[in-house]
Curated annotation (Swiss-Prot):
<dbReference type="GO" id="GO:2000412">
    <property type="term" value="P:positive regulation of thymocyte migration"/>
</dbReference>
<dbReference type="GO" id="GO:2000553">
    <property type="term" value="P:positive regulation of T-helper 2 cell cytokine production"/>
</dbReference>
<dbReference type="InterPro" id="IPR036048">
    <property type="entry name" value="Interleukin_8-like_sf"/>
</dbReference>
<dbReference type="GO" id="GO:0042803">
    <property type="term" value="F:protein homodimerization activity"/>
</dbReference>
<dbReference type="GO" id="GO:0071663">
    <property type="term" value="P:positive regulation of granzyme B production"/>
</dbReference>
<keyword id="KW-0732">Signal</keyword>
<dbReference type="GO" id="GO:2000518">
    <property type="term" value="P:negative regulation of T-helper 1 cell activation"/>
</dbReference>
<dbReference type="GO" id="GO:0090023">
    <property type="term" value="P:positive regulation of neutrophil chemotaxis"/>
</dbReference>
<dbReference type="GO" id="GO:0045892">
    <property type="term" value="P:negative regulation of DNA-templated transcription"/>
</dbReference>
<dbReference type="GO" id="GO:0042379">
    <property type="term" value="F:chemokine receptor binding"/>
</dbReference>
<dbReference type="GO" id="GO:0051209">
    <property type="term" value="P:release of sequestered calcium ion into cytosol"/>
</dbReference>
<dbReference type="GO" id="GO:0048020">
    <property type="term" value="F:CCR chemokine receptor binding"/>
</dbReference>
<dbReference type="GO" id="GO:0008009">
    <property type="term" value="F:chemokine activity"/>
</dbReference>
<dbReference type="GO" id="GO:0070098">
    <property type="term" value="P:chemokine-mediated signaling pathway"/>
</dbReference>
<dbReference type="GO" id="GO:2000563">
    <property type="term" value="P:positive regulation of CD4-positive, alpha-beta T cell proliferation"/>
</dbReference>
<keyword id="KW-0964">Secreted</keyword>
<dbReference type="InterPro" id="IPR001811">
    <property type="entry name" value="Chemokine_IL8-like_dom"/>
</dbReference>
């Protein structure tokens, strides 16, 4: 009886492990049914994607993870895109100019021996 129960438990665990991976390769498709007309505060926007198709839209992703569709021709949307792009390039250039700990140590060592 215990062997049967142990075998059944093993089969259940194996089935759960196999089924867990099914469907993970399917991409999440964002579909806009309506476009937001009210302005979204730019400081709440984390990133965006541009959706082409039957309904062209810009999909903003907020810092809380919400997806909001907006009209790509709206003036506030164009301004928000420029701001988010500027924020991304500013943080990228800032990351490139900050020296690492090893670089700081090397420059200190050169200063001390010079």
């Amino acid at each position: 009886m215990r062997l049967l129960l142990l075998t059944f438990l093993g089969v259940c665990c194996f089935a759960a492990w196999v089924v867990e991976g099914v469907g993970t390769e399917v991409l999440q498709e964002s579909i806009c049914v309506s476009l937001r007309t009210q302005r979204l505060p730019v400081q709440k926007i984390k990133t965006y994607t541009i959706k082409e198709g039957a309904m062209r839209a810009v999909i903003f992703v907020t810092k809380r993870g919400l997806r909001i569709c907006a009209d790509p021709q709206a003036k506030w949307v164009k301004t928000a895109i420029k701001t988010v792009d500027g924020r991304a390039s500013a943080s990228k250039s800032k990351a490139e100019t900050i020296p690492t700990q090893a670089q700081r140590s090397a420059s200190t060592a050169v200063t001390l021996t010079g």
